[in-house]
């Protein structure tokens, strides 16, 4: 069985809003935000291009552990959800990765990859 991470490592708080639908103009409509405390948000900045035509893409991975966040179960229906970090920056969930325990089918953690 995998060991749960050190709580001192889980220092971030984010809010997540599941996308419900789109309005008549094509804008996303989101559910009520859920606050996730004691998660790990690893930010990533990627630069592409060269010279004066560089593009900066901000993304990252939010690590969620069910032994702390047992009220939410993540699956592919959370793709396109909106995450807001503690600085107010917003990201969109692009994939949900479920990590299982090594000896059982129980969920160890989820990785929410965001852009």
Positions of PLM-derived features:
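Short, conserved turn/kink motifs that form compact alpha/beta structural patches or helix kinks used as
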Residues: 18-22, 27-115
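Active-site-proximal polar cores
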Residues: 1-28
């Amino acid at each position: 069985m995998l060991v749960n991470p050190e709580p001192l490592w889980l220092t971030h708080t984010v809010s997540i809003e599941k996308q419900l639908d789109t309005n008549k103009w094509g804008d996303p409509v989101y559910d009520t935000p859920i606050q996730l405390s004691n998660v790990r948000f690893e930010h990533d900045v990627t630069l592409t291009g060269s010279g004066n035509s560089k593009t900066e893409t901000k993304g990252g991975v939010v690590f969620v552990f069910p032994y702390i966040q047992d009220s939410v179960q993540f699956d592919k229906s959370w793709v396109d959800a909106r995450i807001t970090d503690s600085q107010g920056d917003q990201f969109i969930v692009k994939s949900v990765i479920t990590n299982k325990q090594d000896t059982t089918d129980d969920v160890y953690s989820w990785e929410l990859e965001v852009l």
